[in-house]
Amino acid sequence: MTVLHSVDFFPSGKAPVAIEPRLPQAAFPEHHHDFHEIVIVEHGTGIHVFNGQPYTISGGTVCFVRDHDRHLYEHTDNLCLTNVLWRSPDAFQFLAGLDQLLPQEQDGYYPSHWRVNQSVLQQVRQLVGLMERAGDGMDAPAVANREILFMQLLVLLRRSSLMEGATKNDAKLNQLMAWLEDHFAEEVCWEAVAEQFSLSLRTLHRQLKQHTGLTPQRYLNRLRLIKARHLLRHSDHSVTEIAYRCGFGDSNHFSTLFRREFNWSPRDIRQGRDAIIQ
């Protein structure tokens, strides 16, 4: 597995934060690093496999990667990221208690992926721009200024994330997308889902297409196929059982959609034939 080292990304041996844009981020094999990372998705879509679990990411997704997490990107489509790298909580000169603003693992569950709305994403871009222009000076005021900007970023993300709740349409869409991550295998009636999240059906269609480039049903099918591919690789369930577990009522239809999406059949994935190009 590839290991990324802080010496290759941080401007100096003492700098606690670095900005690393990926415009765009191509598919990248599984890796981990000796630093922490906040991944901010500007736009586009892709699959983020985080500690073995696949997540569909798009504009407004924010992922918190710890120094022991492993992850990779695949199936990317114009996926543009900004990575805010930071060494460790004790690398800061003026900041303490950062863990109170970061997602925390509880009972084995780590809420690594948050979502923010588009207006917050614009504020994030502005803050990151200030961080990039803050310079590399190591005198106390310069260091304090950079650390303050990093703290402002954490506060903005914390207050604005899905976890804090919001009422605007794009925030409701973010909540809907998170709901689909957990309920993808269920029969989905889009009219009922739109009503559940206080969106008109037209708004749901328009905003999901703007966020992901996909219609609602196309997005749901892709989500189901991604989950199915994960099970094909990491479980002993039959292809038919996996199809049903992931919301497909017909295994033949599932196989057709699967091949169309990934250019491999479910059996190919089960036998590891795609591993050569992973």
From Swiss-Prot:
In this entry, the residue ranges of the DNA-binding region are 191-212, 239-262
- Which residue positions does UniProt flag as site: Interaction with sigma-70? 241, 250
Annotated Gene Ontology MF terms? DNA-binding transcription factor activity; sequence-specific DNA binding
**Keywords from the named record:** Activator, Cytoplasm, DNA-binding, Repeat, Rhamnose metabolism, Transcription, Transcription regulation
Q: Does the keyword Transcription regulation apply?
A: yes
Q: Does the keyword Ribosomal protein apply?
A: no
The cross-references to Gene3D superfamilies, in alphabetical order and at most eight, read: Homeodomain-like (1.10.10.60), Jelly Rolls (2.60.120.10)
Q: Which InterPro entries match?
A: AraC-bd (IPR003313), AraC_XylS_family_regulators (IPR050204), Homeodomain-like_sf (IPR009057), HTH-like (IPR037923), HTH_AraC (IPR018060), HTH_AraC-typ_CS (IPR018062), RhaR_RhaS-like_N (IPR047220), RmlC-like_jellyroll (IPR014710)
Q: Which GO terms describe its cellular component?
A: cytoplasm
Where does the source fall among the domains of life? Bacteria
List each copy of the HTH araC/xylS-type domain by range.
Answer: 174-272
Q: What subcellular compartments does it reside in?
A: Cytoplasm
Q: Which GO terms describe its biological process?
A: positive regulation of DNA-templated transcription; rhamnose metabolic process
Assembly, in brief, is: Binds DNA as a dimer.
Per the entry, what this protein does is: Activates expression of the rhaBAD and rhaT operons.
UniProt-recorded name of the protein? HTH-type transcriptional activator RhaS
Q: To which species is this protein native?
A: Salmonella choleraesuis (strain SC-B67)
Q: What is the lineage of its organism?
A: Bacteria, Pseudomonadati, Pseudomonadota, Gammaproteobacteria, Enterobacterales
